[in-house]
């Protein structure tokens, strides 16, 4: 977000001034709002129209539209409406689209360091902690530096920490590390390198192409993201085995993009409205995910899907693969190493705090619901 500082004082001043303005100058402000020209932005998401992720994109747009009154309107088109999902960044940078909704890992082909916002080792961080690193630990400046290095002219807002993603959907459960060798598997971002190192033949398909590829036998297994998206995209219609828990993309979040020139042309108060709408959407998305994912998890089990915990041996093998990949990529790409070093330093401090302070909620759940 723009002009982020650890202090909450600017936010309080903004809210105080906004409230005072609404109460004290309503008579003057109303005519200005009603006669002001509406700025309309056309966005595209990287998600199919039926995916809950596209719903999240529309949720953000609605917050902007509501908060800005009639002064700023955002319309969000589904993936492929203007450009393919993996071409969103270029389309926004060039002004073909005014903005977009996706994930940073989809830009992996531009610079491998971009995949580290979600698809990477994480160093024990969860998605919420990675967002803390991004906004308070230097990540935002690093992302801007990478975009400048590849001549991408966008304003980027990260938001919406995603729940831990499953290992994936398979025709039969994956019991051993050796089961991954030779498997045709779908994933994206730096996880492509991780699974390739583990012996898989990886195909980084966009979300809308995964289930048809599984159905036709073009791939043996695939991951997308969560119970709600996987159910809506039709995974349980073609395979019935889902492996839960993985380190392949354990720190992912969404990205909202604006074309920089069009964003810069907005007045300061609308830029600030966008800033706070992103934060509101981030909280709302994380709450909705808990509700919807848990409901869809139950529905998937009712539909005959078999869920298995990914064996610890596979999780350890993932971490070992990450060790090799970050060493190799860090040597090849100075920006990659710069991001890795910054994440590791933040994770060492914040992870120690979280691991020591947070109670074992699973213990309480098992106590109350007799789950052994």
Residue ranges and their predicted role:
Residues 2, 7-28, 35-130, 145-372:
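N-terminal secretory/targeting leader peptides
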